[in-house]
Amino acid sequence: LLIGNKIYKRKQKKQDKITFTTMIITLQKLNIPFLPILDSDIWNKHVSFKAGNKYHIKASSGSGKSTLIQSLYGIQKNYTGDVLFNQKNIKQFSVEETCEWRASKISIVFQDLKLFEDKTALENIDIKRALTNTYTSEKMHEFAEQLGVSHTLNRPIQTLSYGERQRIAIIRALMQPFTVLLLDEPFSHLDQHNIQLASKLIAQELQLRNATLLLTDLEDDNHFQYHQKFSL
């Protein structure tokens, strides 16, 4: 299992079939002790994100945007309140359940991307693809062509521009099965043309999987047809 830029092994099943089941996320009075919470649509509220819907969360610097995303992904646990996926508290997941959940139910693009700097772009993507066996290598190359990064695939990540790295991270996130996609400022270093290309590809994959999208950003945007917008 790939978590950020670390690899963990999980038990292999004889048949690792991909099933896209719906998932509802519920936040119950979620709060971060070290954050000054003022007027927020999320913190210390009861909020539900419905399966298959797209949500935009506008957040200023220092309001806990990345902390929220990391809490939803289960790597930030310094909070009060509850994060529920289909009514199950993620703090109560066993190690095996967490690995299976991250491998088949939830995918993420971190703000800092968490790519392997010394690996090529292709290797970074293929680690996720090979671990989950969701898409063929041909499909991965098709995504790279769509996002205009085919020419970067055999280059080390450390030689790529940040915008190119963001597109590689997006492709990597799409290489696994998921019912929830978390995007933390995914387009911050992309121009409008490349944002349109990336958002089109993401929207196609969301529709295919009937997946929920949670996107955080510093500003409002209309990259997707959002069902609801929040201010953090």
Describe the predicted segments one by one:
Residues 73:
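Helix-to-loop junction immediately C-terminal to a conserved catalytic motif
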Residues 112, 118-131:
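Q-loop/switch helix immediately C-terminal to the Walker
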Residues 181-185:
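Catalytic Walker B motif of ABC-type/P-loop ATPase nucleotide-binding domains
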Residues 90-107:
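ABC ATPase NBD coupling module
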Residues 137-152:
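Conserved ABC ATPase "signature" region
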Residues 156-164:
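Conserved ABC ATPase signature
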